[in-house]
Amino acid sequence: MQIQILGSAAGGGFPQWNCNCRNCRGVRAGTLRAQPRTQSSIAISDEGEQWILCNASPDIRAQIEAFPALQPARKLRDTAIAGIVLLDSQIDHCTGLLTLREGCPHQVWCTEMVHQDLTTGFPLFNMLSHWNGGLQHRLIELDAKPFSIPACPGLRINAIALRSSAPPYSPHRGNPHPGDNIGLFIEDLRTGGTLFYAPGLGQVDEQLLGWMRRADCLLVDGTLWRDDEMRVCEVGDKLGSEMGHLCQSGPGGMIELLDGLPTARKILIHINNTNPILDLDSPERAELDAHGIEVAFDGMSIVL
């Protein structure tokens, strides 16, 4: 299984266009040793020819340009994107579908709750129906058998319901439903390699831990270092837990969780622009290094 990190930042990217926090100001000025990042999305493939997008970032055009395998140029109009899986209906995970409209029709796998959001509160399916067949919904059923995407038959995918939040625009924002957010457990049937992918992870129960223990690689929510980070940085008033994100530090945080898992590789993705782990010289980044936890970056490649 080939995994390409197209984007590794949370919504807004890094630096965020309107943010002058320590991190954003420092990376613009060149005084902070950090790598700019686009908004989170990954691509996966069994053979490296056809690729499945997991989430469609607002930065998808730049991400395609940065990863030539997605534009193989075999004919006048071409793409290696053969399917799209949405893990939620957050704006930073689905707005890229608008940029991909010239390539419609696209097969889009998502849960019924995500499909509802994207036909009501943010009706992308409705809007794009006017472009050559638009988005063709393929239902992801929860607690069902694993599924495969025809273009990459060597990958078997399990969808796992997560405890997190629907987007702010969702009609049921304050009333969470199973399927608002999912994680993916992906297995390569040829190599046996396994990936657990959950860029938005708010709570972890024993059932979810069972999936995480089975994975060779964990690619999980790295949004915030501390739960009150937005307040401390004076850029917002919400806690990470209120937004559906488990912070890294402290009792019950992501570091403690990952320390208890046997996985060979543990990687954080969906990093918010305020998170001190973006600073390569920060004590927080050193703490991750000491625990054997990696931080995803744009252009990172993983083979399982």
From Swiss-Prot:
Q: Which CDD domains match?
A: PQQB-like_MBL-fold (cd16274)
A Pfam family of the record is Lactamase_B_2
Pathway the protein acts in: Cofactor biosynthesis; pyrroloquinoline quinone biosynthesis
Q: Which InterPro entries does the annotation name?
A: Metallo-B-lactamas, PQQ_synth_PqqB, RibonucZ/Hydroxyglut_hydro
Alphabetically sorted, this entry's keywords are: PQQ biosynthesis, Transport
* One example of a Gene Ontology biological process annotation: pyrroloquinoline quinone biosynthetic process
Family membership noted in the UniProt record? Belongs to the PqqB family.
Q: Which NCBIfam families does the record match to this protein?
A: PQQ_syn_pqqB
Function per UniProt: May be involved in the transport of PQQ or its precursor to the periplasm.
Indicate what this protein is called per its UniProt record.
Coenzyme PQQ synthesis protein B
